[in-house]
From Swiss-Prot:
Keywords of the record: Cell membrane, Cytoplasm, Disulfide bond, G-protein coupled receptor, Glycoprotein, Lipoprotein, Membrane, Nucleus, Palmitate, Phosphoprotein, Receptor, Transducer, Transmembrane, Transmembrane helix
Glycan attachment sites: 7, 13, 22
Name of the gene this protein is made from: ADRA1A
Phylogenetic placement of the source organism: Eukaryota, Metazoa, Chordata, Craniata, Vertebrata
Protein name: Alpha-1A adrenergic receptor
Record PTM text: C-terminal Ser or Thr residues may be phosphorylated.
UniProt topology in membrane: Multi-pass membrane protein
Length: 466
């Protein structure tokens, strides 16, 4: 990260003419570092646009990801170009004042990025541990306050050298060296890396424990019966639920379990994606924060200039690879990236021609007819359906819950009297409204046709989302 690379520790305070530049080496470094910087800038811009242009990504978790992308974008656009020029030329060409400002901005952006990952880890712990209460715990206001605290703490850590907390600067202004003042190195290493890292590791360890426990609990509630057609039926049982009770209470229990399973599966998948981000962060930054304090407190063990430059740029690399991680580990981001690259911004509502249309036959026919895998479970005056199609150990689970008629735009097909077609726009995961109509068309124009909200999710045999 941070305080700036430099090879000034072996230089004198006397002004010396810059060494001649090796042209072939400069061109090679320029191409490699320039490509890395360009990739980081464009990738982080793509992350920001993907969230900004898709309403279903307008959540507190994704705002944290945008904050991470903003910090990385500032680093790759305002710090890395000067770092690359420094490496290519072999000396600092922008003066002492700008060297100090550049160093402070470097520390600011890197610290904000690391603390942003810390906030994300806490967010994922809450999401996995309390999936149903998450929206009330993590509100937009609290999310904004957390981000303000991140940048405030980052600013406090970064401005110390601007107020004199550093070793005396060399007289030669072509030298822009790293701040090796032991007190500041310890303060910045603890505040910028080790304390956030400790929080991140604790949070993700707890996420792992909770996810394992919840997966076992949810799996125990899935009772399946195999048939010759390799179709299985989902039966929901609420743990510790009373044996007796009204049908309404039982139905509410089943619905609550289903919603809990959906929310937990989504939060767990998000935690996996961001866990990969954190893993890459540790691999990129840990070498630097091991080398830096050792070189400051034990000069005899200071690594060579080449080793220092490698671990220094390895930390910078972290700000460029996050945009690769999102689409590779999240289908949600992959589709959002594709839409942005195709200039298909979805800020506005999609037109009806892009809406998903589904036709559903009456449930009585589905249960008694050819669709033996469709099970009808009464939920009060409404209905819930569960279906699992088993293929190579992967099951597709569909949860149908009734919803108000006004939530979907309903059109009755004149050619198909056995069903009614409903259309609705998909959101963060597949959400489709289907209408179950009577087997014969109704003569009453004001007849209220019930609608059904469909949630589709793929589960493996152990109940985990795939």
């Amino acid at each position: 990260m941070v305080f700036l690379s430099g090879n000034a520790s072996d230089s004198s305070n006397c002004t010396q003419p810059p060494a001649p530049v090796n042209i072939s080496k400069a061109i090679l470094l320029g191409v490699i570092l320039g490509g890395l910087i360009l990739f980081g800038v464009l990738g982080n811009i793509l992350v920001i646009l993907s969230v900004a242009c898709h309403r279903h990504l307008h959540s507190v978790t994704h705002y944290y990801i945008v904050n991470l992308a903003v910090a990385d974008l500032l680093l790759t656009s305002t710090v890395l170009p000067f770092s690359a020029i420094f490496e290519v030329l072999g000396y600092w060409a922008f003066g002492r004042v700008f060297c100090n400002i550049w160093a402070a901005v470097d520390v600011l952006c890197c610290t904000a990025s690391i603390m942003g990952l810390c906030i994300i880890s806490i967010d994922r712990y809450i999401g996995v541990s309390y999936p149903l209460r998450y929206p009330t715990i993590v509100t937009q206001r609290r999310g904004l306050m957390a981000l303000l605290c991140v940048w405030a703490l980052s600013l406090v850590i970064s401005i110390g050298p601007l107020f004199g907390w550093r070793q005396p600067a060399p007289e030669d202004e072509t030298i822009c060296q790293i701040n090796e003042e032991p007190g500041y190195v310890l303060f910045s290493a603890l505040g910028s890396f080790y304390l956030p890292l400790a929080i991140i590791l604790v949070m993700y360890c707890r996420v792992y424990v909770v996810a394992k426990r919840e997966s076992r609990g949810l799996k125990s509630g899935l009772k399946t019966d195999k048939s010759d057609s390799e179709q299985v039926t989902l039966r929901i049982h609420r743990k510790n639920a009373p044996a007796g009770g009204s049908g309404m209470a039982s139905a509410k229990t089943k619905t609550h379990f289903s919603v809990r399973l959906l929310k937990f599966s989504r939060e767990k998948k998000a935690a996996k994606t961001l866990g990969i981000v954190v893993g890459c962060f540790v691999l990129c930054w840990l070498p630097f924060f091991l080398v830096m304090p050792i070189g400051s407190f034990f000069p005899d063990f200071k690594p060579s200039e080449t080793v220092f430059k490698i671990v220094f740029w390895l930390g910078y690399l972290n700000s460029c690879i996050n945009p690769i991680i999102y689409p590779c580990s999240s289908q949600e981001f992959k589709k959002a990236f594709q839409n942005v690259l195709r200039i298909q911004c979805l800020c506005r509502k999609q037109s009806s021609k892009h809406a998903l249309g589904y036709t559903l036959h009456p449930p009585s026919q589905a249960v008694e007819g050819q669709h033996k895998d469709m099970v009808r479970i009464p939920v009060g005056s409404r209905e819930t359906f569960y279906r699992i199609s088993k293929t190579d150990g992967v099951c597709e689970w569909k949860f149908f819950s009734s919803m108000p008629r006004g939530s979907a735009r309903i059109t009755v097909s004149k050619d198909q009297s056995s069903c009614t077609t409903a259309r609705v726009r998909s959101k963060s995961f597949l959400q489709v409204c289907c209408c179950v109509g009577p087997s014969t068309p109704s003569l009453d124009k004001n007849h209220q046709v019930p609608t059904i909200k469909v949630h589709t999710i793929s589960l493996s045999e152990n109940g985990e989302e795939v």
